């Protein structure tokens, strides 16, 4: 799978992924994302991988991610454990998969 982030290839890639677990599957999704977090944070190109649940609806998940550059992001999305996670996640969430929102820093 190739996803091209809308940034200069040498700049950091920042995004958040969001998805909603099916009713009764939120804790299972939380356990899966906790395991994925350990793997992703070990990647040399990962800067930040912070999963969250919405307080008002714990079935809704948001993951804030930052990678060193586009190559580090591609390494993340092609990692074998990511493919296993995404395949399993598809049966536990609403819709077709995670919705990705690309981010760019606001200059200070």
Which residues make up each language-model segment?
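Localized chelating/binding microdomains
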Residues: 34, 63, 96
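Short, surface-exposed ligand-recognition loops at beta-strand->loop->(often short) alpha-helix junctions
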Residues: 20-27
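Hydrophobic pocket/interface hotspot
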Residues: 17, 29, 49, 63, ...
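An amphipathic, aromatic/His-enriched active-site/gating alpha helix that lines ligand/cofactor pockets
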Residues: 39-47, 66-100
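Active-site-flanking beta-strand signature of metal-NTP-handling nucleotidyl enzymes
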Residues: 13-19
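Glycine-rich beta-strand-turn "strand-cap" elements at beta-sheet edges
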Residues: 1-11, 51-59, 85-108
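Short, glycine- and small/hydrophobic-rich beta-strand elements in well-ordered beta-sheets
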Residues: 38-62
């Amino acid at each position: 799978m190739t996803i091209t982030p809308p940034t200069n290839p040498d700049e950091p890639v920042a995004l958040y992924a969001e998805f909603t677990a099916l009713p009764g599957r939120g804790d299972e999704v939380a356990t899966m994302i906790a395991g994925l977090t350990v793997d992703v944070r070990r990647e040399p190109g990962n800067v930040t991988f912070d999963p969250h649940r919405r307080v008002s609806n714990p079935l809704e998940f948001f993951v804030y991610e930052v990678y060193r550059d586009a190559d580090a992001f591609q390494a993340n999305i092609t990692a074998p454990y990511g493919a296993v996670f995404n395949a399993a996640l598809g049966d536990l969430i609403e819709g077709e998969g995670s919705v990705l929102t690309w981010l760019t820093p606001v200059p200070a």
